[in-house]
């Protein structure tokens, strides 16, 4: 590695840009590695898993860029700044930076003072400094912002290159109008709706974008609603961008008529994550996405999912169920809809790699599941929800479900399979699990995730460790329901 030239090292470290632990370790290898890693780390220094209010050195680095006059003024106001150091910084850190995270900046400035007014002054000086020192601004998370940073003299030149904006609706509309004036090349726009209002300013920002590719909207508030068609302006603005948007994520609390007209027009979508609850079966037939690759939908919408999948273009690689709550006993037509869903997947999505399935443990469903495994040979990850529609299924039934499931996986699992997640009404006896792991020998190393606490018992832990040591399984973890649904494995 030490003999690799700088260009190759840069490409390697670029792949680690989201892995702060590895990048920080690389800093310590030698000067060459350090010189390559620092610009990567400082491109977006606020995105790493750091308790910023404890990191006084980061505060000190930024303060060191302030002029003596500004430092003196801030000190007179009551801010506690680091002692002046005449040692020259090894790097011009801010010249590498291309991002601002308002929440993190607020956390950092709390080091200088506990008083809100003094923190505001510090933040103002930091933002002014960033506008002068940053070569460009690519990423801005301005949730709960209090500073009109786009009115600094240099702001226009920095904001012209803004690529990603994360915001929320607690922000005064004037901020969105200000951004719309200078930011017209945003590719990714993420909005958290925490304050129902008239969304004219956000709609204006959407309308002026020339190449918006990714849009995300998430409602994060309770009742009451703001009207009968609260998202109309947002959806009509998005309608003007159907030729550029290919990633769409919408979580609306309220249903409206406009979405029925607008959503079918996004004919270039590659990612679709939304709720189809308000649409009838006839309406859903007009939702045709031939380029769709990633599709996420709620557990309860099996029929809608089947229709979307059937009308897709066969390019789907990820089909995933999302939910913030657990399944209950009120899933209508569960047996029929789950069987049809499995069939639609293996008929229409032969290239699928990441797949969620929910079905009852009947012989017919197990047969359909096995057909799917034999056809979908690209599968890397399976999320299996075996659900019996019973309050407390007998343990005997849970073990029978588990034994049948493991037999099917041994017989028919594709060779690419690296990860399996199990939820609900399935449990593995010690004997069945050992037989499965023994027969898995010689296949790709496997990660398993489940939420049943039985696997924390001593005899199971001993068995799992045995097959970990033998290289049969990479991981076998028992987690909470939400972790099983949401946690990311590196497969």
Task: List PLM regions with ranges.
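Alpha-helical structural elements of signaling/regulatory helical domains
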Residues: 18-21, 254, 300, 314
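Leucine-rich repeat
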Residues: 92-99, 131-139, 156-164, 181-188, ...
């Amino acid at each position: 590695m030490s003999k690799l030239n700088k260009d190759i090292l840069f490409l390697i470290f670029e792949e680690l840009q989201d892995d702060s632990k590895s990048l920080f370790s690389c800093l310590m290898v030698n000067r060459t590695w350090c010189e390559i890693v620092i610009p990567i780390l400082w491109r977006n220094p606020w995105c790493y898993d750091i308790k910023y209010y404890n990191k006084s050195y980061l505060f000190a680095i930024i303060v060191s860029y302030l002029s003596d006059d500004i430092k003196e003024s801030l000190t007179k106001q009551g801010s506690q700044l680091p002692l002046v150091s005449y040692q020259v910084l090894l790097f011009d850190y801010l010249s590498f930076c291309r991002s601002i995270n308002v929440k993190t900046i607020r956390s950092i400035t709390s080091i200088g003072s506990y008083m809100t007014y003094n923190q505001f002054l510090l933040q103002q000086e930091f933002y002014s400094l960033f506008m002068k020192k940053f070569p460009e601004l690519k990423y801005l998370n301005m949730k709960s912002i209090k500073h009109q940073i786009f009115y600094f003299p240099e702001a226009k030149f920095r904001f012209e290159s803004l690529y990603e904006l994360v915001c929320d609706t607690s922000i005064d509309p004037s901020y969105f109008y200000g951004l719309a004036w200078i930011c017209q090349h945003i590719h990714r726009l993420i909005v958290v709706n925490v304050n129902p209002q008239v969304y004219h300013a956000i709609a204006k920002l959407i309308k002026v974008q020339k190449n918006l590719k990714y849009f995300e909207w998430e409602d994060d508030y309770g009742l009451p609603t703001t009207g009968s068609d609260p998202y109309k302006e947002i959806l009509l603005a998005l309608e003007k961008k159907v030729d550029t948007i290919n990633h769409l994520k919408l979580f609306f609390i309220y249903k409206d008529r406009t979405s029925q007209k607008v959503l079918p027009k996004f004919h270039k979508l590659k990612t679709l994550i939304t709720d189809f609850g308000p649409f009838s079966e006839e309406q859903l037939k007009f939702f045709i996405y031939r380029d769709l690759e990633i599709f996420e939908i709620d557990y309860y919408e099996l029929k809608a999912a089947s229709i979307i999948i059937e009308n897709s273009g066969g390019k789907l690689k990820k089909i995933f169920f999302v939910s913030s709550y657990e399944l209950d006993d009120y899933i209508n037509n569960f047996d029929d809809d789950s069987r049809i869903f499995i069939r639609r997947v293996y008929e229409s999505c032969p290239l699928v790699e990441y797949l969620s399935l929910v079905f009852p443990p009947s012989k017919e469903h197990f047969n359909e599941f096995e057909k799917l495994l034999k056809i979908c040979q690209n599968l890397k990850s399976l999320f299996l929800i075996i659900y019996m529609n019973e309050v407390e299924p007998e343990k005997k039934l849970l073990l029978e479900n588990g034994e049948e499931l493991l037999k099917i996986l041994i017989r028919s699992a594709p060779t690419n399979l690296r990860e399996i997640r199990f939820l609900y009404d399935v449990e593995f006896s010690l004997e069945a699990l050992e037989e499965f792991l023994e027969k898995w020998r010689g296949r790709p190393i496997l990660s398993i995730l489940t939420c049943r606490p039985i696997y924390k018992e001593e005899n199971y832990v001993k068995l799992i460790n045995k097959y970990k040591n033998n290289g049969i399984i990479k991981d076998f973890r028992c987690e909470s329901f939400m972790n099983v649904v949401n946690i990311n494995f590196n497969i």
